[in-house]
Amino acid sequence: MSLSLSDIKFPESWELIPNERNYIDYVYKESVELGVWRPDNKRDLIAHNNVVSLSKFFWPNMDFERLVMGGELMVWFFTFDDALDAGIYNDEQQAQVVKRMSDVFMNGTVEDDASGPEKMALHLRNKCEVMCGERKDTFNRFISSCIQWVDSIIPFNKIKIDGASPDIELYSYLRKINIGAFPCVTLTEVMLDHEIDHYVWYDPRWIKMNEDIAIITTLINDLVSYEKEVNDNAGDLNPLFFIQKQRKVPLTESFKEVVGLINHWVKDFTNLEESFMKSHKFKNSKQKRDFECMLEHLHYLASGSKLWSMQTPRYCSPTSPFIEMRKQSSSPNLTNSISIPTNNTNNSNNITSSPNKKQKIDITSSSAIFTTREIIN
């Protein structure tokens, strides 16, 4: 049986050529110095290269400095989320870990025993604050979107009731926040020295376009991760899998339904985009171009997710149901778990200035290690 991702139809204007990859090594060195990855660890390096390569698809036209910021966001996303998914924390500990990370963005501080992901979050937050300058509203939108994403992780992980998969509508509603698209969009706003009027961000069409792209990106991710999640006994939160179970249909029918949903949201997005561009009165050509850059980023989140998925060892497999992804991974056979120390490394040449410190809060002894699972097979 062969399924094809070509059934997903994007407008030609959404096509992209990925950016350069020279930023990946730079972000790796940063991540080691911040204690996110272990130095000279091959598995961590492979994991890093996989997840950080997303940035060149999401920001294909940005310069090196901004690509690095996108890479830092990807490192933070994957390591923090996978730590909460790893099963090493009970409910109370998870809530404390989430509160600590929210405080990093809220207050711009870390604890004395800050984890690698917490230090990466502060590092990126500080960069964004400097880049925003007087654009306080832009900075606030970025940190608010990051806090919103952090707060979404535990509720999404508890979406199953009595072990049953959710309905696709409930799944999509929660996942559009949990997928992490909104921090990518607000980071793009940080990257642009724009002249867009503040009220644009509260236009319901702009908000809905963001939600549409988040759902599209979610469903693409669910398609390409299907084989991996089923093999890892994690298919109950994958629509391609749970639609089969709920409706007692074969994989081909489930795939057809998911693709239909993607194409529906693409059409809804393009209608909203056309409506906005026809009705909005831009003050000058720069303001219009700035907004077009924001729209392009939304396009690239969807099309970039698809392109990245067709080449990453994270999902590609000779036995994938998708013909575009049937590639022999060149990565070594790794275990499903990668232990990542979160304390400071022995490298004394830290890339950041000393962050503001708060009084240490003891979560548990297990907080010394984040276990990042399933970054790569």
UniProtKB/Swiss-Prot annotation:
Gene3D superfamilies: Farnesyl Diphosphate Synthase. A motif (NDxxSxxxD/E motif) lies at residues 221-229. A motif (DDxx(x)D/E motif) lies at residues 81-86. Keywords: Lyase, Metal-binding. GO terms for molecular function: (2S,3R,6S,9S)-(-)-protoillud-7-ene synthase activity; metal ion binding; terpene synthase activity. Its EC number is 4.2.3.160. SUPFAM superfamilies: Terpenoid synthases. InterPro entries: Isoprenoid_synthase_dom_sf, Terpene_cyclase-like_2. Terpene synthase that converts its substrate farnesyl diphosphate (FPP) into the sesquiterpene protoillud-7-ene. Contains several highly conserved motifs that are important for catalytic activity including the aspartate-rich 'DDxx(x)D/E' motif and the 'NDxxSxxxD/E' motif, both of which are involved in complexing metal ions to coordinate the binding of the isoprenyl diphosphate substrate in the active site. PANTHER family: TERPENE SYNTHASE, TERPENE SYNTHASE 2-RELATED. This is Terpene synthase 1. It comes from Dictyostelium purpureum (Slime mold). The gene is TPS1.
